[in-house]
């Protein structure tokens, strides 16, 4: 699940130039009047994961954008890795923030940015401006054309490609100006807790933790139950389940893991039931026990790692 969710951070030529991230989100943007609830949940989750990152951060929300700004020095890689574990984020953009002044000042900042990031490289590029603050004296298309021309003059090794450029230099003009060109992929999905809580039947295989990850990605908090049957299942097997739960919890938030001693039930079924039906009867009782725990803990659904047509073990 982890490798599926979080792509490696792309190379940034000079990480020290970045003190902030613009956070892009996907599905939340199509919500209606309650969109702010999902945005607030996402902001809270971002704040929570950044508590474990070296450095101090301020997370703000502004007109369809979420910004993470570092106050002083911080661990860049650690911050990116933490944000890549937050469901609801589709993109993490390292940004340079400058004060909103005139066009000449903006041009100077953009030239410095391109020099640091792509100086000497044969790249195709385009400039994309979003002028949210209409008080800026030039329109978006005008800014794109003028900055594109200046980049060509300053960096003759670069060429324009407005259809499939190697680099898109984004400029967002708001209360301040945000400059960025890299978009680090996030896991997507919905913010945790926006769709209730469910109980995961967790085993030592790969299917159930992946199922838990996929449901958590839809905004569902996860609890888990594991059926332990010593001496037929070892302590090592139980520890493997605990380790898997920790891996899922890196994305889903804290997981309450319920460990059920299943030995007596398993032996009773073995003694009393037809042996060709043992597997399905044991699974039936696992479902019943998981359902009872789910009802007692406020979980609204059960999650399993089963596939249609799969042979049970």
Question: What role is predicted for each listed range?
Answer:
Residues 259:
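Conserved residues in the N-terminal Rossmann fold of short-chain dehydrogenase/reductase
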Residues 146-151, 157, 188-195, 262, ...:
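Active-site adenylate/phosphate-handling loop in enzymes that bind or generate adenylated species
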Residues 13-199, 209-255, 264:
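RNA-binding accessory domains that recognize and position tRNA/RNA substrates
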Residues 205:
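Conserved G/P- and acidic residue-centered "switch" motifs that form tight phosphate/ATP-binding loops
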């Amino acid at each position: 699940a982890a490798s599926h969710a979080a792509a490696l951070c792309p190379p940034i030529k000079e990480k020290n130039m970045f003190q902030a991230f613009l956070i892009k989100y996907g599905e939340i943007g199509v919500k209606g009047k309650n969109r702010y609830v999902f945005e607030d949940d996402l902001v809270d989750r971002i704040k929570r994961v950044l508590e474990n990152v070296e450095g101090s951060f301020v997370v703000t929300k502004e007109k369809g954008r979420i910004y993470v700004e570092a106050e002083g020095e911080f661990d860049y890689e650690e911050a990116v890795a933490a944000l890549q574990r937050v469901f609801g984020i589709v993109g993490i953009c390292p940004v340079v923030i400058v004060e909103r002044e005139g066009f000449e000042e903006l041009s100077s900042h953009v030239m410095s940015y391109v020099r640091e990031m792509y100086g000497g490289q044969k790249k195709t590029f385009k400039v994309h401006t979003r002028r949210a603050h209409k008080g800026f004296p030039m329109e978006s298309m005008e800014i794109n054309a003028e900055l594109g021309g200046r980049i060509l003059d300053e960096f003759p090794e670069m060429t324009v490609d407005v259809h499939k450029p190697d680099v898109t230099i984004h400029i967002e003009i708001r209360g301040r100006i945000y400059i960025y060109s890299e978009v680090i992929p996030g896991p997507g999905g919905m913010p945790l807790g926006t769709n209730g809580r469910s109980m995961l039947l967790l085993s030592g295989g790969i299917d159930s933790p992946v199922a838990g990850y996929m449901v958590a990605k839809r905004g569902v908090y996860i609890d888990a139950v594991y059926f332990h049957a010593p001496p037929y299942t070892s302590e090592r097997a139980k520890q493997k389940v605990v380790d898997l739960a920790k891996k899922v919890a890196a994305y889903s938030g804290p997981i309450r893991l319920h460990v059920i001693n299943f030995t007596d039930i398993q032996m009773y079924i073995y003694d009393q039931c037809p042996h060709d039906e043992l597997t399905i009867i044991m699974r039936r009782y696992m479902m019943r026990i998981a359902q009872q725990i789910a009802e007692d803990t406020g979980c609204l659904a059960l999650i399993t790692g089963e596939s249609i047509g799969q042979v049970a073990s």
